[in-house]
Amino acid sequence: MKPGIHPDYRPVLFHDTSADVFFLIGSTAETDKTHTHTDGKTYPYVTLDVSSASHPVYTGEQRKTKSEGRVAGFNKRFAGFVGGKGA
């Protein structure tokens, strides 16, 4: 590899601020901030808005937008008209 053109790969402390969870991961992310981790060492620090600790897809708290099909919704809406009094 050519020297001097690759970013430094080092441990970086990522903080998911919405879930208040820290991840210590090897990364090339650039930052001027530092933070002391629970192991007593100081690492470069990057804040995150969303991570696997807080995203609804990973936490299982996603909303069900469509719980039934279109036909079931139609039948539910017009159930009073079907099977009513015969002529």
Swiss-Prot record:
It comes from Pseudomonas paraeruginosa (strain DSM 24068 / PA7). It comes from the Bacteria. The lineage of its organism: Bacteria, Pseudomonadati, Pseudomonadota, Gammaproteobacteria, Pseudomonadales. It holds the Pfam family Ribosomal_L31. Coiled coil: none annotated. PANTHER family: 50S RIBOSOMAL PROTEIN L31, CHLOROPLASTIC (PTHR33280), LARGE RIBOSOMAL SUBUNIT PROTEIN BL31C (PTHR33280:SF1). This is Large ribosomal subunit protein bL31B. Keywords: Ribonucleoprotein, Ribosomal protein. The keyword 4Fe-4S does not apply. HAMAP family: Ribosomal_bL31_2. One of its GO terms (molecular function) is structural constituent of ribosome. One of its GO terms (biological process) is translation. GO terms for cellular component: ribonucleoprotein complex; ribosome. Part of the 50S ribosomal subunit. Belongs to the bacterial ribosomal protein bL31 family. Type B subfamily.
